[in-house]
Amino acid sequence: MILKKLVYPFLLVCLFSTGTFAQRLMHSIGITPTLLFGKSDDGYNSDVMIYQNMITYYPRFNFVENENSSISIGAPIGVGFGLARTTDYSDVGISFSYDLPVALDYNIGFKSTMENEHYFGGYLGMGFGYYKVSISKSAYSDFSGATYGPMARAGVRIGSAKESWKGHGLTIGFFYKKGIEKAKFSSAGCNVLVDL
């Protein structure tokens, strides 16, 4: 998949970057509760929901910066597990998944740049997401599907004096991805991340 070919090299560069590049590279880590929903392809056309709790690592690189804002590209990748079920509870299973999105964001205020001293900020962005799910202990145990499509995202960043949070901040964001694969599974979720 083309997305995998883009994300993996990006992550390697993020992990081994130094010098000036590292000053523009910012990291966050946290949790992302996510809900996937769509129709089953079992012939019954049942409504299916998959609830996931994911651990998320988000490296982002600011490639345009000014005093109070930036434009960044990032990859809020995650891995997690959860429950898959039909909406009438006729079938329930355990799911494992990973998420490989790429996001382009406009950042303003707090943590838009390393030098920004505001205590409040936010972001608005778009991207493309790839989400792989495997289900076990269910009638859908053979399902090992992927959902992918365009994504919209937005959120706020909150900080405080360096003495209390040691310069770290908190990001609370929301996203929605519309699946364009055959099953057309969509996903929505909330990021709660600590900005390092």
How should each PLM-predicted stretch be described?
Residues 1-26:
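Cleavable N-terminal export/targeting peptides
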Residues 10-11, 29, 163, 183:
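A periodicity- and composition-biased signal for non-globular, repetitive helical segments
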Residues 17, 22, 38, 82, ...:
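Ubiquitous "structural anchor" signal
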Residues 17-19, 31, 86:
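Intrinsically disordered/low-complexity terminal segments and short unstructured peptides
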Residues 21-68, 188, 193-195:
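Short glycine/proline- and aromatic-enriched beta-strand/turn motifs that initiate or cap beta-hairpins
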Residues 23-35, 73-77, 122-126:
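Transmembrane beta-strand segments of Gram-negative outer membrane beta-barrel proteins
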Residues 58-71, 79-185, 191-196:
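Outer-membrane beta-barrel transmembrane domain signature
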